[in-house]
């Protein structure tokens, strides 16, 4: 019994995700696909537009055989920590043999070479990066420009491609924890990441979200698997959409409650950024205005939004220090994959639970992370058009389709 792992957000699930799951099974020869999915918040620093249970069910109905939750400290993190959290869950689950991911280049060997460069940066390359940062570039832009100046074009290009960057970090994470997972790059088809263009039955998740927010939901039907469109229509105006603006005042309130020292302890706050946040949240009452006031070439908007979401949720310190707090929360499985769940219980190095009552299996640090996950679900629920009672997300049984 072979399984391939995928780390994803499915925000929302679309035809490109179904294609990736199909190709991942084909390329790996796996019988099952295990998806590690971000929960209530995603890497762009926003709440997931649709609640996690609905997104998990969409994945199970369209190629995934099991969906595991990626805890918020890793879902709301840089590419490095996001990848490390997902890879650690897959590796310690004991049931994944490989990890597949979308890639602009589709060349696993090239990504291996890129990972080697990051793990062994020459002093000259480091100096170029520092020089670019001193000119006001964000770290990702400074690094990409330095690589463009220092590396062969073919190798440098992968550092400017969002999915390739994640692929590189998956490979680095595998090496970092000495995992046996085999990385498999799946060439992207259709449109680029975050593109507003369409190609056949494909468009980006960001374009689908844009169409939903602008009231043009009827235009997304061609780009999502059959059945999901009706699901979306049934929840829009009730449990969706959840957006950053939906939690605007709550986020500004959370920022205003914090001292400069507390702001400094948030993940990714460096170089005096706490001073800018401290001033901006006292000048503006809207999170969009706060972000605009703080934004500069040095900080990407995604990074700033992640910091603000961490303030709202009470996430402090580096996610790298939370690896020993991980547990495996199974959101759902396919009925035909019951044997996969049995194998998970047998082989996992981490506590496994499928219902809230199983939290007694967790140690103190894992219980703290579990409490954070409950808090994230409760806060995300406040952003719904019809807010939900607390802990409602954890009161449901395991999804079986």
Question: What is the predicted role of each segment?
Answer:
Residues 56-71:
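A glycine-rich helix N-cap at a beta->alpha junction
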Residues 1-55:
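N-terminal catalytic cores of NTP/NDP-binding nucleotidyl/phosphoryl-transfer enzymes
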Residues 49-53, 61, 77-84:
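Generic alpha-helical scaffold signal
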Residues 25, 56-60, 172-175, 209:
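Class I S-adenosyl-L-methionine
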Residues 31, 65, 97:
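Receiver (REC) domain switch/active-site residues of two-component response regulators
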Residues 25-26, 60, 87, 91-92:
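Non-catalytic positions within long, well-ordered alpha-helices that form the structural scaffold/packing
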Residues 69-401:
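Active-site cores that bind ATP or allylic diphosphates and position pyrophosphate for catalysis
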Residues 8, 42-43, 59, 73-74, ...:
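Short, contiguous strand/loop micro-motifs
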């Amino acid at each position: 019994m072979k399984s391939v792992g995928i780390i994803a957000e499915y925000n929302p699930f679309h035809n490109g995700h179904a294609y990736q799951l199909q190709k991942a099974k084909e390329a790996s020869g796996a019988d099952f696909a295990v998806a590690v999915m971000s929960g209530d918040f995603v890497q762009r620093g926003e709440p997931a537009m649709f609640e996690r249970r609905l997104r998990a069910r969409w994945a199970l109905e369209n190629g995934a055989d099991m969906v595991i939750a990626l805890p918020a400290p890793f879902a709301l993190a840089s590419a490095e920590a996001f990848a490390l959290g997902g890879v650690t869950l897959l590796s310690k689950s004991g049931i994944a043999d490989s990890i597949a991911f979308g890639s602009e280049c589709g060349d696993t060997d090239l990504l291996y070479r890129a990972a080697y460069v990051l793990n062994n940066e020459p002093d000259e390359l480091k100096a170029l990066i520092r020089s670019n940062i001193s000119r006001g570039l964000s770290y990702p832009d400074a690094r990409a420009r330095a690589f463009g100046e220092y590396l062969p074009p073919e190798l440098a290009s992968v550092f400017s491609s969002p999915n390739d960057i994640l692929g590189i970090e998956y490979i680095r994470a595998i090496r970092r924890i000495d995992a046996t997972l085999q990385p498999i790059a799946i060439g992207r088809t259709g449109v680029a990441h975050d593109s507003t263009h369409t190609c056949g039955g494909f468009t980006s998740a960001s374009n689908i979200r844009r169409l939903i927010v602008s009231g043009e939901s009827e235009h997304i039907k061609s780009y999502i698997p059959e059945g999901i469109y009706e699901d979306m229509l049934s929840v829009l105006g009730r449990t969706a959409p959840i957006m950053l603006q939906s939690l605007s005042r709550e986020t500004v309130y959370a920022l205003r409650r914090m001292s400069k020292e507390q702001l400094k302890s948030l993940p990714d706050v460096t170089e005096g950024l706490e001073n800018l946040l401290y001033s901006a949240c006292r000048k503006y009452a809207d999170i969009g205005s706060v972000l605009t006031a703080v934004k500069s070439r040095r900080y990407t908007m995604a990074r700033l939004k992640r910091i603000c979401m961490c303030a709202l949720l009470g996430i402090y310190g580096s996610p790298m220090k939370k690896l020993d707090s991980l547990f495996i929360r199974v959101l759902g499985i396919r009925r035909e994959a019951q044997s996969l769940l049995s194998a998970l219980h047998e082989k996992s190095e981490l506590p496994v639970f499928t219902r809230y009552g199983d939290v007694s299996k967790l140690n103190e640090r894992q219980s703290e992370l579990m409490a954070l996950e409950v808090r994230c679900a409760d806060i995300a629920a406040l952003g719904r058009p019809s807010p939900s009672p607390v802990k409602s997300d954890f009161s449901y049984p395991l999804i079986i389709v």
